[in-house]
Structures are given as C-alpha cells and as structure tokens.
Amino acid sequence: MTEAPHNDPSRCDGPAIKPYYGITGKSSYFVPSLWNGTEYKDGPGGSMTVSVTKTGTITGTVTGSGEFSAGAIIAKAKTTVSVSIAASFAIAVGHTYTHDIGKKKYGHLQYGSWGYKLSWAKYASSADRCHIVKVSTGTAKLPTKSMGWKYWETAS
C-alpha cells in the first residue's frame, strides 16, 4: 500500500482558520429613540416646535442566521466603518427644535442617532480545511454619537 504524497492536491492539511467577521455592506441609517416623548406629529400646515428634556438609551440591533457574536460584529464595525459606533448610547435630550410644515401636510419629528445599517458575514474553514466558507450572515442597525431630530412630512 502506498500513501498519497504530501503534495497531492486532493489533500488539504492547512491549519483551521479561526472564525472571523466581515462587514459586507453599509448605509446611513437613522436609529430612533424608542421611549415616550421623543416622537411628535403636528399639522396640517403651520410650524411645529418641540422641546424635550429626557434621558434614555438608544440601542442598536444585530440579527442573523446561524451562530454569531453581536459583540464581535460591533467591534468589527468600529474598526471598519466608524469608531463612533456602539451597541448603545445613554443620552440626555434637552433642546428645542422648530420646523415649518408644508401646506396641507403633517410634520413628524423623531429623536435618535444618525447611525448605520450594516450587512455582515461570519467566515470559517471548510470541513476539509481547503477553503474559507461563509457560515452566518445578518444585519445590524447601530447608533453613533451623532444625535438629533429627524423631520419628515406626510399627507395625513
């Protein structure tokens, strides 16, 4: 019986690659605060002024398929997208904002963070250690230190 030589291309003896994460896409995304007193609607027409003093936390989300570490994904996002990204931010809202509303329109204001929506993937060695394979994917909506009011109008 003869053994396959070490240079046999049908064998892969490489070391297993430690699983790692990659950010596969990003876009700007408004992460709204979800506590009472930070979302307003007024109209039709005129102007709206909001003033609020509130403390709370704006929290991001990480979702996906397969096994993954939200902390590792957030750490990767901090190094490849923006150092100001975090899982959550504790904030104190305390300012006044005024905006004109278009005729026959309703104005909406929502406080939150100008953050990012990310796509991510987790990679690892294939079972035969010949290839790198994607083992998990998902999305994350993460806040940054940039906070403020988002304004939009609707017909009703």
Regions found by a protein language model. Name each.
Residues 44-105:
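Membrane-insertion modules used to breach or fuse lipid bilayers
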Residues 14-20, 28, 47, 106, ...:
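Low-complexity, intrinsically disordered short peptide segments enriched in small/polar/basic residues
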Residues 1-40:
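N-terminal prepro-regions of secreted/extracellular proteins
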Residues 88-140:
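Membrane pore-forming effector domains from diverse proteins
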Residues 3-6, 61-63, 123-124:
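Residue-level signal for mature regions of secreted extracellular proteins and peptides
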Residues 141-156:
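Short, low-complexity, Pro/Ser/Thr/Gly-rich segments in the mature regions of secreted, periplasmic
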Residues 37, 116, 122, 151-154:
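Intrinsic disorder/low-complexity segments enriched in polar/charged and small flexible residues
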Residues 24, 51-55, 63-65, 69-71, ...:
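A structural detector for beta-sheet-dominated domains
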